[in-house]
Amino acid sequence: MDVLEMLRASASGSYNTIFSEAWCQYVSKQITATMYMYCALGMMGVLFLAWFMYFKRMARLRLRDEIARSISAVTNSSGDLRGLRFRKRDKMLFYGRRMLRKMKNVSGQMYSSGKGYKRRAVMRFARRILQLRRDNMPLEMRTVEPPAEYLEETIEGSDRVPPDALYMLQSIRIFGHFEKPVFLRLCKHTQLLELMAGDYLFKITDPDDSVYIVQSGMINVYISNADGSTLSLKTVRKGESVTSLLSFIDVLSGNPSYYKTVTAKAIEKSVVIRLPMQAFEEVFQDNPDVMIRVIQVIMIRLQRVLFTALRNYLGLNAELVQNHMRYKSVSTMSGPINSQTSQSSRQTPNGPPMGISHPLNLMQSTASGTGSGSGSGVSVTVTRPPPSPSRHSREEHTLSDPNPNPDGSVHGTSNLFTEVHGDAPNADLFHQQQQSVGNLSTRRSSITQMTPDGSHSCPPAPGVTTSIDMRLVQSSAVESLRKELGLSEEDAHIIEPFVELRELEPNVTLITEGNADDVCVWFVMTGTLAVYQSNQDATRAKQDKSDMLIHFVHPGEIVGGLAMLTGEASAYTIRSRSNSRIAFIRRAAIYQIMRQRPRIVLDLGNGVVRRLSPLVRQCDYALDWIFLESGRAVYRQDESSDSTYIVLSGRMRSVITHPGGKKEIVGEYGKGDLVGIVEMITETSRTTTVMAVRDSELAKLPEGLFNAIKLRYPIVVTKLISFLSHRFLGSMQTRSGSGAPGAPVEANPVTHKYSTVALVPITDEVPLTPFTYELYHSLCAIGPVLRLTSDVVRKQLGPNIFEAANEYRLTSWLAQQEDRNIITLYQCDSSLSAWTQRCMRQADVILIVGLGDRSHLVGKFEREIDRLAMRTQKELVLLYPEATNAKPANTLSWLNARPWVTKHHHVLCVKRIFTRKSQYRINDLYSRVLLSEPNMHSDFSRLARWLTGNSIGLVLGGGGARGAAHIGMLKAIQEAGIPVDMVGGVSIGALMGALWCSERNITTVTQKAREWSKKMTKWFLQLLDLTYPITSMFSGREFNKTIHDTFGDVSIEDLWIPYFTLTTDITASCHRIHTNGSLWRYVRSSMSLSGYMPPLCDPKDGHLLLDGGYVNNLPGHLWRYCRASMSIAGVFPPFCDYRDGHLLLDGCYTNNVPADVMHNLGAAHIIAIDVGSQDDTDLTNYGDDLSGWWLLYKKWNPFTSPVKVPDLPDIQSRLAYVSCVRQLEEVKNSDYCEYIRPPIDKYKTLAFGSFDEIRDVGYVFGKNYFENMAKAGRLGRFNQWFNKEPPKRVNHASLNEYTFIDLAQIVCRLPETYAVNTADLFSEDEDCDGYISEPTTLNTDRRRIQVPRAGNSLSFSETEMDSDVELDLKLERKTDKSTQSSPPTSSRTSMRGKEEARHMDNWHWGAKHKNETGSGATEGIHTSTEQEQEHQQQQQQDQGVRAEQLVYKDEDKENRSSANNETKN
C-alpha cells in the first residue's frame, strides 16, 4: 500500500478532526470508565487469594494432627501383639486373602475409581490448561531436513570383487554388456605389465591393438604436434583405461592400426592390465550377437558424444569429418572391377587415403561371363587435387539455394567427362558398348526420378546417361555395394534383389536431420551429395533456413552407415548437389542381409571410421566413459578440476557443503548438460559435490583435450565464452532471487524440467490407469510423449525382458524412447515388482498419487519406494472428484507424514476417472477421449506444464484500492485463453491472488473482493481500532478480522494453485517468501504498511514482517500470511509470524512485483501486473541549500509559481522503496516477463469505494491489451497449447515403427520381440500384435511445441480384448462382416514367414473386431481395412520389402473416414 497520501493529508490538517477531537474524547472516556473497573477487580482478586491461602493452611494443619494421632495409637498397641503368631491353617488363609486383595486393587485400576484416580484427573486437567494455547494454534508443517542419503554420495565399497577384475569389468563396459561366460573368456587373455617411472606404455608406430587398464600407479597420455612438440592429453589414474573405439573397429575389420600421434608414459611405478583386442575376435566368432551389439554400442557413443556434444558445446561441425577429394577411376568398359584398387582404399584407415583409386564400372554386367570379355574400351580416371590447407572451411547453405558453390564437386555426368576431355563424351562410345552386351536376362530394377517437390517420375536421365542400359547400371551398382559391404562374389545374389536406383535433380533432399523413417545406405554412382547439419550458431531468424555444410559424398563413396548401425534417427540432412544417380538399400533390407552375413556390420562401421577426421581419433583416445549407479559421486568438493563431464543419460545433483557442515542443493543436471566446465577452465578446485540421482552415463573430457582443440581450432574459445556467459548470467539471476532465508532450496528453473516421470499409487483404490491417460492426454498438447507399462514392455521386447541377461536390450530401448520424446511416463505396478523397481531407477521425478479425501497414513509399499529411490525427487499428487465439489483440506497431515515429498499438487478430476470399469472399458473410453483437444485450464494440463518446464506464472503487485484492477485483469486473462499455473502477490495483490487460488471462479472471486472492499470503507470500525501511535496508528484487530473472515482458517498448502506471497522481514532485514503456512496471516503481513499497522510477528521464528513491496512489489493458515503481506508500516502493526516470531511488514517495501521470485520457482512465462503508485520525478532544482521558510512562502503565496520539493514523509517513503524500484526495473527489462500496468493512476490508494469502477478499467484495458498481443503474434508463448479451431487429423507414428533396433536380435534370430504368454492376453494394455504406442510424432523439433495439438488418430495400449463371453456374443452377431473384412495374408507370409504371418493375422482380426465393437473409437486404433491393405501392398511392390515393419502407418483423414464408413455399412 502507499503511505505517502495519508501522511500528506495528515500534515496538511485534513485529519485534525479525527485525531484531535474524536480520538481524544474516546480515549479519555474509555480510560475513565475502565480505571474504576480495573481497581475493583484488583481488590476482589487480592481478597480471594488471601482467603484461599488461609483455608489451604488450615487444612494442612488438621491433616498433620490427624496423622500424628494415628501413629501414636499404633505404637501403643504394638507391645500387646508382639508375642502372637499365626496358626498354620490361619496362615494360608491370611496370605490368600492378602493376595486376593492385591489383585482386586489391580483390577480396580481399570475403572474410573480407586487409588490415584483423583490425582490423575487433576493432572489431565492441568495438562489440558497448559496445552490450551497450543491446541488453538494452527497445524504447522514440520521442517524436516531431507535424509542424509538425499544430499550425500554413496561411499564406494567393492570388497567382494578383486580390484583387477573390477577395473577390467568397468573398462570393457564401454563396449556394452557382457555375460559372465564371455567376460571370463576375455579375462584369460589379460596380461600384467609392470612399468617404472618414465617407461613407455606405447609409442608412435606401435600397434594399436590393445585395451590398457591401470591397476596401480599413473599413466600420462601425450599427443605429438606437427612441429615435434608434445601436449598432455590426459592423466590415467587407478581404475581408468586407455583405449580407442575406432581402433577397435579397425582391428576387427582386419586393418592394422598404429599409433601415429599418441604416446603413453608412466609417471610413477605402475601396473597395467593389457587386454588384446584379438581376444574379442575369438569371442565374436562363437557369439556373433555380442559382436553386433558391441559395434552398435560404439556407433551410438560416437554419434551422441562426438557428433552431438562436441558440436553443441565446442562449435565443431565440419572439423569432425574428412572432406578430402578421393581419387576416382570411372571405367566406361564392361569388365571386372579391379579388386586390388578397391582393397587399397582400406590400407590406411586412420589417415587421409591419398592416392586411392576406386573404380566405378557403370557398364559391367552381373551375368557370369557376359560382357567380361568384350573389347577394350576407354578407361577414364578422374583425379582431383586434395583440399586446401585451410582448417576452417565452412559453408553456409540455404535450403532454397539451387546453385551449388564451385568447390570442385562433380556437377552431373557431363561435367565428369568435361573435366578430363574438355567436352562432353561421344555418344557413339556408349552406343557401341550397348551393342556389345547383347541380349541380357531380365533383372529386377527399381529406377525412379525424384523431383524437388517430392513427386516420383521416370523421365530419361540427364546428359549422356540416356543411352546407358539400366540393367548394366543395376549390375554395376550391385557389384559396387557388394564390395562396400565386404561380401564375396558368391554373395552377390543376396543383395541384388534389394538394390534400388534413383535419379536425382539438384537440391533434392534424401533425408532430413532427425528423421528415423527414411534411413538407407546410399552409394553415389554419378554426381555429388552434400551432407548438412543444422547451424547451432545461427540466430533464431536464420536457424530454420540455414544449414551447415559438413562434407561432400562423391562417386564411389557410401553414406548412411552411422544411422543404419545405431538404429536411431539420422544426424545429418543429405541433399543432392547436382544431377546424380545413386544406388541405395533400405534399412529393412540391410537387416535381412545381416541375418545371412553378420560381418557386414564391420564393413559398415569401417566405412564410418574412414570418414572421420584425425581430431576425432584424438578425442577418442582422450574420452573416458563413466557409468554411475544412483548415489555415486562424479567428483567431490575441493578436489582438483582436470576434466569436465557430459551427461549422456540420467540425472546429476550438485550439492555444496558449508563450513558448518550443512549441505545445500545448488542445482541438477539432465541429459546433454555439461558439468564442471567452469572449474576446469578457471583452474580452481571443485566448489560442489556432484552425484548421480539415478543410474547415469557420462562422458569424461579431460583438460588436455580442450587445450589441444583450442590450439588447433581457436573458434572453440568463442563458443566457450558464449556458453560460460550464459551460465554466469543465469547463476546471477538465480542468486538475486534466492538470497533470502525464505527462498526455496531448488532455485534452478532447469530442475523442474523432467524427461522421465514414474507414477506410483499409494493404495489399490487409486485409479492410476485413468490418471495416467489424463496426464498423457494433456502432455500430448506440448510435444511427443510416451506411456509405458510392464505389459507394454513385455509385448514389445519379450516376456523375459526383465531378466538380467536382457539388461542391455531393456536399457537401450528405454534410452531410445527417452531420446525421442520430451517426456516418458512410467506407470508402476501396484506391487514392488521388477518393473516397479525399474521405474524407480529410470525416473527423474516420482509422482506419488493418492486420494485427497482418504486417510493420509503411509503404506508399506510407499515406504519401500522411498527406500529404493532415496535421492530421486518425489512429488505428491492428491486427486479430488469433481462431482462432490470438495476442496483440498488437511494437506499438512499428508505432507508431515511424508517428509521426503518436496512438492504437492491438487488435481480436480472429472467423473470418468473414478468410474469402476474393466480395463477394456477404460481403454475404450479413452480411445475416444484422446481424440479430443485437452482442456488447457485443467489441473492435468497445469501438472503437464510443470513437468515439462512450461509453467505460466501470474504476479500481482501492490497498490491499495487500485488492486481491484487485478480482478478485471484476471477476467481478461481467462477470456484470452491464458492458463495460470502459479500465482504470487504482494500487499493487495496477495489478497486477490489468494482469492483466485482458493476459488478459481471469477464470479466468486469478484463477490468476495467486493465484500472486503466494502468493509474497508466502514470508517467507524477503523476508528475503534485506533491506538496510541507508538508503533502504528491502528492496532490491526479489525483489519485482521476482515481478512480472516474472507479466507477462514485455510492453509497455503490447501490452495488449488501453487501460491506464494512476499513480506518484508524487519527482524532479519530481508524479504521472505511464504509458500506454506497460515494464509490470512501472511496476506496480512504483506499488507502491513509502515506507520499505519504494526508489523506481523512470524509465528515460526518471531521475526517482524512488513509489506513485501518495500523490497519487491511484484512477487500455514492462509489469512495470516495475507494479513502479513498487508501490514502497512505505521498504519497496521507488524504481524508476528507464529512459527519463528519474526515481524512481517508489507512486501511492497522490498519487491512490489516479484516476477523474479516467480521465475526462480519454476515459471517459464510470467505475466506481471503492477498497480502501484508512481513517484513524481519532475522536481524543482532549488540549488545547494533549502530554506523551509522559503517553501512555506511559496506554498501560501498564490502569486508565485509552485515548487515541487519532497517533504519529509515523501523522502522517507522514497527511501523505503529504493530496493523496490531497482527490482522493478530488472523485471521490466527481463525476457521471461510480460509487464502490464493498467491506467489506474487517477485512483487513490484508499479509494476502496470505487471497486467496480477500478475493476472495469482493468478489464477493458486487459482485454484490449491481449487482443493486440494476439494480433502481433506475441500471445503464443502464453496460450500456445490453446486451439479454437476444430480438431484435425494428424498422422502419428507408432512405437513399433520407430522402435529400438537390436541388431543382435535381428541378425542372430533371437526370440521374437512380440511373443507374449497366453496369461498376458487379457492383461492391461493388451493387443494381439504387441504394443502400439501413444500418439506421438517422434520428431523432436522445437517448433513442434509451438503448434497446437489437434485431435487426431491415436494408437495406444487400449486395444485389450474383451472376455471370452463378450467375444463369442459379438462374433455371433457379426460373423459375416468378420469374414468379409479379413485381410489376405499371402503377401505377409512370403515376407515374414509363417509364424509372423499368423501373428499378423491375429492382430488384424483384433483390429477388425475393434472396428466392429466401437464406431467412435476406430479412429484411434491402427487398423487395417481392405483399402489400406491394397495400398500397403502397392507400396511394398514399389519400394521393396520391409522385413522388420511390425505395424503399418495410418493413412490420411479422408481414407480413414471412408474406410470407417464402409466398415459401419
UniProtKB/Swiss-Prot annotation:
Q: Which UniProt keywords apply?
A: Developmental protein, Endoplasmic reticulum, Hydrolase, Lipid degradation, Lipid metabolism, Membrane, Neurogenesis, Phosphoprotein, Transmembrane, Transmembrane helix
**Which SUPFAM superfamilies would you find in this protein's record?**
cAMP-binding domain-like (SSF51206), FabD/lysophospholipase-like (SSF52151)
* Enzyme Commission number(s): 3.1.1.5
Segments of skewed composition (Polar residues)? 331-349, 434-454, 1413-1424
Q: Where are the transmembrane segments?
A: 35-55
Q: List the coiled-coil residues.
A: none
Give the residue ranges of motif GXSXG: 985-989
Q: Write out the residues that bind a nucleoside 3',5'-cyclic phosphate 3.
A: 600-727
UniProt key word Ribosomal protein: no
Region (Disordered) residue ranges read 331-421, 434-460, 1371-1465
Q: Which CDD domains match?
A: CAP_ED (cd00038), Pat_PNPLA6_PNPLA7 (cd07225)
What Pfam families does this protein map onto? cNMP_binding, NTE_Ploop, Patatin
On this chain, the residues bearing Phosphoserine are: 446, 455, 1201
**Hey, which stretches end up on the Lumenal side?**
1-34
Q: Which domain of life is it from?
A: Eukaryota
Provide the catalytic activity annotation.
a 1-acyl-sn-glycero-3-phosphocholine + H2O = sn-glycerol 3-phosphocholine + a fatty acid + H(+)
Please indicate the residue ranges that the annotation assigns to the motif DGA/G.
1107-1109
The residues on the Cytoplasmic side of the membrane are: 56-1465
Q: Where in the cell is it found?
A: Endoplasmic reticulum membrane
Where the record annotates domain PNPLA, the positions are: 954-1120
Complex formation:
Interacts with Pka-C3; interaction inhibits the catalytic function of Pka-C3 and the esterase activity of sws.
The record's similarity note reads: Belongs to the NTE family.
Q: What is this protein called?
A: Neuropathy target esterase sws
Name of the gene: sws
